[in-house]
Structure formats: structure tokens, C-alpha cells
Amino acid sequence: MAESVVGEFLEFLKKNKRLSKNTLESYSRDVEQFLTYMNEHGINFCSAKKSTIVNYLYFLKQQGKSQATISRALSSIKAFYHYLFAKKKIEEDPSYGINAPKVEKKEPVTLTVEQVDMLLSFDFGKDEKGLRDKALIELMYASGLKVSEVISLKIEDVNLASGYIVVRSGKERVIPIGSYAVAALQEYIEKGRKPRKGEKALFLNLRGKRLTRQGCWKIIKEYADKISPGLPLTPNILRKSFAQHMLQNGADLKTVQEMLGYEVNFGNNLLSLVSRSKMKEVYNKFHPRA
């Protein structure tokens, strides 16, 4: 019964809340882990009490989970029981009144310009994998793209002659890329990306299919471990490093936000206040690898 109820809950979220696939997966994972915990303690999910949830949160803390992870788990559990209560599957919501632990705000981790240079000076090799990986990492630092945006790029979205890429996932935008990224992409497209019939994705795995989110993370971690074990490197850290280095070098916040895809809201109009030529000018002046 629990599995079918969780399925109904996730379907409700999908239809009514319009959550991303990753967010839905987080809800599913959090709720299923809580149900497993209750099952191991002989507790039916319909009979859970406030103390059951509080004890579970304490259990997560004892497991060394971060406050952010515990807060997210509680948020998922609350959503699950709000749903059950609204659908009259339970008479009382046991999650009501439980507050999440305060999450400590940490300074965002970024790489130094020297660390980025060390990373991108690595000998990636000239085979299919090496050319792809070099182009991927160069582009991520050059553009500040999210993983989902990088893997969604198509060949037709890249204009190497003009030094621009078109990002179509999320808020569509045209952003400049520097000479290092252009050179790496050109070499990858010409020598490393083998034509695959019907496959338009820019970045492919070694089987000729579109690179996945997990594949992208794996590539980044591989080179972090090779270059400097313990180096804090994830796709999001590359994105944050792009923004921080631009701002440190004097770029204005508004232009950097436009490049990152943030919407600037003025009254009832959502305006792109930075022209393409202005963005290119700022990029060439302030990006370390323009």
C-alpha cells in the first residue's frame, strides 16, 4: 500500500506543482527512506506520530547528515503528510508544527584563477574522450552554464565564428564564450565528436548518445581527482567560479546575472537590459580566459 500511495503522491506533485525531475526524485528518495526507517521500527506510515518524525530527524543527525539534508528530508515528509491529510487518508497530520533545523550559511566554495588554470592546463589527450572533456570543462567555466543547460546544447546552438552559444533550456539567452573555449570546442567538433545519425547533442558519451547529467559530474570529478585529490570541484563550483572571477575583475553584476540566466524584473516587464554587443564587450574585458 505504501508504494502505491507514494506513487500517487509523486503523480500529484508532478501534475499540480510542476516540479523538475530532479526535485521529484528528491521527494521520492526522502519519503522512501523515511518509510524504510518506519518499516524497520515496525511503524505503519498511517500511524506515524510527531515523535516518529522527530526521532527520524535525530537519526539522520546521528548518521552525520548535514542540516541542509535534514531540512530537505523534513520538507519532503511534510509535503507527503499534507497530501495524505488533504486526501483524507489519515485523520491527523503528524508533521504539523515540526520546524526544520536552522541551516548554517556557508561562504560559496569557488576555485581560484590559478586552480582553474591548473585544471585547464592538464593534458586531456587528443582522443575522442580527451577532446570532449577538455571542451566540456572549458565551456562550463567560460559560460557559467548549469549541468542541465550544458547537456541540452545542440551542435546548432554553437556559433564558433562569432564566439556565442545559444542556451535554449530555461530562460533562452545568447551568451559569449572566450577564445580558449572556442578553440577547444572547434577541435572537439572537428576531430573528437564522431557524427552520429540523428544525434544533434553537442556533447556525447562514448556510445554516441547525449551525455547525461551523471556523466558530466563523473567527468568533472575524474579530473579533480587526477589534478589535485580533494580539490573542491563540481559543475556548480565551476559556475560560481565563473561568476566570482568576472565580478572580481570588475564586471557589473547585471551583466553577469544575464549571462547566468537570471531574470531582471522591472514592473510588469521582464527585460533583457544587456545587449549582445555590450555583453561581449564586458566578457572580453573581464573573463580570465576570454
Swiss-Prot record:
Residues 106-290 form the Tyr recombinase domain. Its main location: cytoplasm. It comes from the Bacteria. The active site is at R239, Y283. Pfam families: Phage_int_SAM_1, Phage_integrase. Keywords: Cell cycle, Cell division, Chromosome partition, Cytoplasm, DNA integration, DNA recombination, DNA-binding. GO terms for cellular component: cytoplasm. Gene3D superfamilies: 1.10.150.130, Intergrase catalytic core. One of its GO terms (biological process) is cell division. GO terms for molecular function: DNA binding; site-specific recombinase activity. Residues 1-85 form the Core-binding (CB) domain. It is found in: Cytoplasm. Belongs to the 'phage' integrase family. Site-specific tyrosine recombinase, which acts by catalyzing the cutting and rejoining of the recombining DNA molecules. Although strongly related to the XerC and XerD proteins, it lacks the Tyr active site, as well as the Arg-His-Arg-His (R-H-R-H) sandwich residues that are clustered with it. It however contains the Thr-Arg-Gln tripeptide, which is characteristic of the XerD subfamily. NCBIfam families: recomb_XerD (TIGR02225). This is Putative tyrosine recombinase TTE1313.
